[in-house]
Amino acid sequence: MNLAKSMYADVLVLSPEGRLDHDNCAAFHTALERYLEEPASSVARGVVFDLGSLEYVSSAGLRCFMLAAKQARAHGGKILIAAMQPVVAEIFEISRFSMILDAFPTVRAALESFSPESARAYDRT
């Protein structure tokens, strides 16, 4: 699994690629910690997970997202989900994670919910 990072104004976009399951969840969580352990004001207003390149997520992967959201909230931040592929969206819906994490159809829509500046920065790329 790869985890690409982009910053749009005051919002961090993290883009996992491939599969998120028991085999790589610990490494994924470790990679996330460096972005989530800082207070929101010092790093970013929030984090958007662009799941457009995530092919599959298991229950272990869902747990990683839940822990990330909890950690972000503890530091005054917020996590949003965007651009889920149909299979991943179905897993989120069946597991009712759509009630835990706010999801948006596009990265731009998620960015807009954080700040107009981040959406404009995204439009310039």
Cite the ranges covered by each PLM segment.
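Short beta-strand/loop segment at the start of cytosolic alpha/beta domains
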Residues: M1-S15
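Short leucine-rich amphipathic alpha-helices used at interfaces
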Residues: N2-L3, G46, V87, S115
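General small-molecule cofactor/ligand-binding pocket signal
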Residues: A4-S6, A82, D102-F104
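Residues that form or immediately flank small-molecule/cofactor binding pockets and catalytic motifs
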Residues: Y8-D10, P86, R108
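Short, glycine/acidic-enriched loop or turn micro-motifs at the edges of active sites
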Residues: G18, S53, P105, A109
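Amphipathic alpha-helical interaction surfaces in cytosolic regulatory modules
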Residues: L20-L101
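A charged, well-structured terminal subsegment
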Residues: F104-T125
